[in-house]
Amino acid sequence: MRNAGYQVFKQVFTLAKSISPLEFKEKTEEKRGLTLANYSSYLVNINRLLFWKILPGGEEYLSREEIKHLPVEKKGELFRGWIEENCKDLTFLNLSKAGLTYLPPEICQLSQLQELDLRENQLTALPTEIGQLSELQYLYLNQNQLTALPAEIGRLSQLEWLDLNQNQLTSLPAEIGWLPQLQWFYLNQNQLTSLPAEIGQLSKLQVLYLNQNQLTALPTEIGQLSELTRLFLTQNQLTSLPPETGQLSQLQYLFLNQNQLTSLPAEIRQLSNLLQLHLGQNQLTALPTEIGQLSQLQTLDLNQNQLTALPIEIGQLSQLRALELNQNQLTSLPAEIGRLSKLQWLGLSQNQLTALPAEIGQLSQLQWLYLSQNQLTSLPTEIGQLSQLQWLELNQNQLTALPAEIGQLSKLTKLELAENPLKDIAEKIRQRFRL
């Protein structure tokens, strides 16, 4: 840990030499006889200079003869007054990739700031003064090393966009719920194990990203996010969803891939505006019959689960375009699957299907059908009715023959049949697909 701290200081020290070269001439960090006290002081002042250099007119001011000869400490003392005189009306500030390890408290003087970009620095904490930016609407803090947020973050009453992706946050302060205008909240790739109940107070929140954290559960208050349209929870450790999830009446996109879900609550039926539901790589053994009530659903991803059957209610998903069921344990499909009149993509590879229902032929919009690695011994003649089919994968099954009706599929451009014990293929099919 000490070595890591030294490396950070060494990097900042190097930056300081470029900003205040005369002071550092013929000196090294060893010769300065650093103590913890002057280490901290230098760190603060060096970050002030890095900050100052980026402010409008800052670099020009620091280049003046009477200024550049001053010690770092003296420049630091001038910083507050200079900001007050030159930057109090600033509304936008880009400090991304500035090499900052510390955000100077003078940030609070930029009282008119509406957008602050601090992405790709090395910040481990924020000053409490951040809460004084009462006009701030957009705050970018992604790709830093933040381990916590100050409670004062809750004072940013105008904040609409908060990006904290790729930090090291393990928790959020309760005050996060005090952001009445927040609409977009990004928390991907942190180390969050839970969310505060107060997150439910974000009444205007529309988008919430929580991918790649360590969440094991969601608070019941999540259901209070009445304006939420997108919820991303991929790569967490969720074992269940609270029934209150069903109260997210405006939700359109729900991503839950790569969790440990074993079931879904019946309340999922209440998500009447849901367009996409992603549940791949979980441990689902069955779907609730209520899933059929998702009347607007267009994409349903259930890849890599442990499903052995589908409820007949699956046929009620009248708007479904894509159904992903690869790598499950399905032995059959319900006849009702034929009612999915808008389905374009059907993935069924790596299951245990021995037959397809005749109703498969009713999928008049189907373009892609994946059936590799099953135990199919035959195909229904109705497969020839799939007039829009372009791609048909049947590798690694037990097919000994193909129905001649496959020759009727005028739009079919790809037919894969490898590793089947085929004995009889109609000449028309053989010639067309060069089998």
Q: What would you call each of these model-derived segments?
A:
Residues 1-105, 115, 124, 128, ...:
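The feature captures the LRR N-terminal capping module
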Residues 110-111:
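Short, solvent-exposed loop/edge-beta patches enriched in aromatic
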